[in-house]
């Protein structure tokens, strides 16, 4: 199955993607992760991307789509893929569609995890992270010892972009950028809205009911 995953900051997209990766044995492809991997490994596209990133500029669409195309050509993508973080604009969606058809892996469904703004603010304001990669929530998933990571014992910290004023700006920006894509995929009959409020297991079950149609 070939899937694109949308969801605002704090919607639990990463959590669901991790579980879907395990359940369906299709790789979770985060464009940010694969871009950083290409830069780290010094690939041709990675060097090209680094040139823009070092200058604080956005990586051009043609470089991003090249990185995605190369990742989809890897053997673990044969059963399908779960693409996260791309597209972000309708021109990117058009370019992605062309590439996916060209390589014989056309998009089958776009999942949009939908959560109300106030719920997202509550979720994100309580989020604390560790340098080891672990993430906690002071209300929903607190560490055993206050402000200390269960996994490695290091102090937890709150990212600047998890503070309320910044969160609201991020949500406004997300809606402004993503709404045209929601309409774009809705018109193509590919969009499925998922209620992202409530228990993680229930949300996962709802997603699986949708994706099982594409197995």
Curated annotation (Swiss-Prot):
Top class in the EC scheme: transferase
Q: Does the record's keyword annotation contain Kinase?
A: yes
Residues the record lists as binding AMP: 31, 36, 57-59, 85-88, 92, 159, 170
Query: What ranges does the record give for the region LID, renumbered to this chain?
Result: 126-162
Instruction: Return the similarity comment.
Output: Belongs to the adenylate kinase family.
Q: What does this protein do?
A: Catalyzes the reversible transfer of the terminal phosphate group between ATP and AMP. Plays an important role in cellular energy homeostasis and in adenine nucleotide metabolism.
Summary of subunit composition and partner proteins: Monomer.
Q: Name one GO biological process term.
A: AMP salvage
Q: NCBIfam families from the xrefs? A: adk, PRK00279.1-2, PRK00279.1-3, PRK14527.1
Identify the pathway. Purine metabolism; AMP biosynthesis via salvage pathway; AMP from ADP: step 1/1
User: What is the designated name of this protein?
Assistant: Adenylate kinase
The EC number of this protein is 2.7.4.3
Query: What residue ranges are annotated as transmembrane?
Result: none
Tell me what organism the protein belongs to.
Methanococcoides burtonii (strain DSM 6242 / NBRC 107633 / OCM 468 / ACE-M)
Its predominant location is cytoplasm
* Short name of any one Pfam family annotated for the protein: ADK_lid
């Amino acid at each position: 199955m070939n899937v694109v995953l949308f969801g605002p900051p704090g919607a639990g997209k990463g959590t669901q993607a991790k579980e879907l990766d395990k359940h369906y044995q299709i790789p979770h492809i985060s464009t940010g992760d694969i871009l950083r991997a290409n830069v780290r490994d010094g690939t041709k596209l990675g060097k090209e991307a680094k040139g823009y990133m070092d200058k604080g500029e956005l990586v051009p669409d043609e470089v991003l789509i090249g990185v995605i195309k190369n990742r989809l050509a890897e053997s673990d993508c044969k059963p399908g893929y779960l693409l996260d973080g791309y597209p972000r604009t309708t021109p990117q969606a058009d370019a992605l569609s062309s590439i996916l058809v060209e390589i014989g892996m056309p998009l089958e469904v776009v999942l949009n995890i939908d959560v109300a703004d106030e719920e997202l603010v509550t979720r994100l304001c309580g989020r604390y992270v560790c340098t080891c990669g672990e993430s906690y929530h002071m209300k929903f998933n607190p560490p055993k010892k206050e402000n200390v990571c269960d996994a490695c014992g290091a102090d937890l910290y709150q990212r600047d972009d998890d503070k309320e004023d910044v969160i609201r700006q991020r949500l406004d920006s997300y809606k402004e950028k993503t709404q045209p894509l929601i309409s774009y995929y809705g018109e193509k009959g590919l969009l499925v809205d998922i209620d992202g409020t409530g228990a993680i297991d229930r949300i996962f079950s709802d997603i699986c009911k949708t994706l099982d149609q594409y197995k």
